[in-house]
C-alpha cells in the first residue's frame, strides 16, 4: 500500500488508516477474535497506521492485544476524549491508554474534540510536556474548526488534523483543510464512508441495534436518507461501470483530494480490509473526479447527530 508523509516532518503512513472505532463496539457488538484477525489482515495488506481513542469503548484494549509483537512497524494514533482537559485527567488518560495499548509511547496523540471551558494554552502545554517525556511523539487535533486550529497552533506545532470529510459531507471542513495544507499539517480524514452510509448497504427503514450509535444520526432516516441513498446508488452505478463499487469510490475520492494524507476507514471484517486495499490502488483521474462532482451537483447536507424522537 502506498504511503505518504504525515505533515512536514511526521512519519510515513499508509494512505488507508485503520479506524478502530467499530472494533470497540461503537457500531454494535464485535467478536474480539474476529477483530484481531481483521487487524492482522490489515497489516498484511500494507496498513501501518491505526487510529483509536480513549473514548472508543474497548477499542484500545483490543488493538493493544492485536499489536503485541508488531508495534515497531506501526504508527499508532489515539485521542484524549471527553470534556475534562484538566492536567490531572490528561495524565490519567495518557497513562491508561499506554497501559491498555501495551506500549510505552503513542505516535500521534490527539485532542478528540475542542473543549472551550479549558484554556487551550494549558492543554497544549501539558501535551508538550508529554512529548518531552517521550510518552507521545507528535500532537494532533480532531474535529477542530479552522479558528480552533489556529488557536492551537499558536501554542505549539501540530502534526495532524482529523476532520470529518467525505464525498457527501465536506463543505464545512474546507477552510480547515486549506489552512492545514498551507501550514504543513497532515490530514487524517475520518467518516470517509459516513458511518457506512456511502457503502450502499443500508436501505430505507433500517433499524440499528440499541448499542449502535448510528441510530442517533439524522441522515440514516427520513427524507434526508432517501435523497442520499438515491445519490449513493447513482454513484455505485458509475463505479460499477469501472469494475469498482461505491465503497471504493468514496475512499478513493477522499485520497484524491489535495490536502488529505490518509483516509481513516473503519474495519470489522476481512472483506472490509480488502475493499480498503482496492480503494487505495484506485487513482481517480481529473476527468473522473469531474464526472463524480457532476453526479453530486450542489447537494451539501449538514452532518447532524441528535436523539431519535
Regions found by a protein language model. Give the residues of each.
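Acidic (Asp/Glu)-rich catalytic clusters
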Residues: 7-10, 64-72, 95-102, 131, ...
Amino acid at each position: 500500500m502506498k504511503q505518504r508523509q504525515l505533515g512536514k516532518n511526521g512519519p510515513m503512513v499508509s494512505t488507508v488508516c485503520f479506524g478502530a472505532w467499530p472494533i470497540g463496539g461503537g457500531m454494535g457488538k464485535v467478536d474480539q477474535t474476529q477483530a484481531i484477525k481483521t487487524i492482522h489482515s490489515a497489516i498484511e495488506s500494507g496498513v501501518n497506521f491505526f487510529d483509536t481513542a480513549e473514548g472508543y469503548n474497548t477499542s484500545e484494549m483490543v488493538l493493544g492485544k492485536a499489536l503485541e509483537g508488531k508495534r515497531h512497524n506501526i504508527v499508532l494514533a489515539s485521542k484524549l476524549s471527553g470534556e475534562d482537559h484538566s492536567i490531572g485527567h490528561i495524565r490519567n488518560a495518557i497513562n491508561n491508554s499506554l497501559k491498555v495499548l501495551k506500549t510505552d509511547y503513542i505516535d500521534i496523540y490527539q485532542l478528540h474534540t475542542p473543549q472551550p471551558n479549558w484554556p487551550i494554552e494549558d492543554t497544549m502545554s501539558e501535551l508538550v510536556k508529554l512529548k518531552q517525556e517521550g510518552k507521545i511523539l507528535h500532537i494532533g487535533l480532531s474535529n477542530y474548526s479552522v479558528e480552533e486550529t489556529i488557536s492551537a497552533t499558536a501554542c505549539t506545532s501540530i502534526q495532524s488534523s482529523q476532520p470529518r470529510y467525505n464525498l457527501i459531507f465536506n463543505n464545512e471542513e474546507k477552510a480547515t483543510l486549506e489552512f492545514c495544507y498551507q501550514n504543513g499539517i497532515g490530514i487524517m480524514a475520518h467518516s470517509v464512508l459516513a458511518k457506512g452510509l456511502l457503502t450502499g448497504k443500508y436501505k430505507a427503514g433500517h433499524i440499528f441495534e440499541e448499542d449502535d450509535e448510528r441510530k442517533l444520526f439524522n441522515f440514516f432516516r427520513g427524507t434526508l436518507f432517501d435523497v442520499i441513498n438515491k445519490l449513493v446508488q447513482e454513484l455505485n452505478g458509475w463505479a460499477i461501470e469501472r469494475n469498482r463499487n461505491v465503497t471504493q469510490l468514496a475512499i478513493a475520492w477522499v485520497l484524491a483530494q489535495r490536502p488529505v494524507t490518509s483516509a481513516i476507514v473503519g474495519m470489522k471484517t476481512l472483506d472490509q480490509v480488502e475493499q480498503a486495499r482496492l480503494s487505495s490502488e484506485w487513482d481517480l483521474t481529473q476527468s473522473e473526479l469531474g464526472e463524480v462532482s457532476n453526479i453530486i451537483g450542489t447537494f451539501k447536507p449538514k452532518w447532524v447527530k441528535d436523539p431519535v424522537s
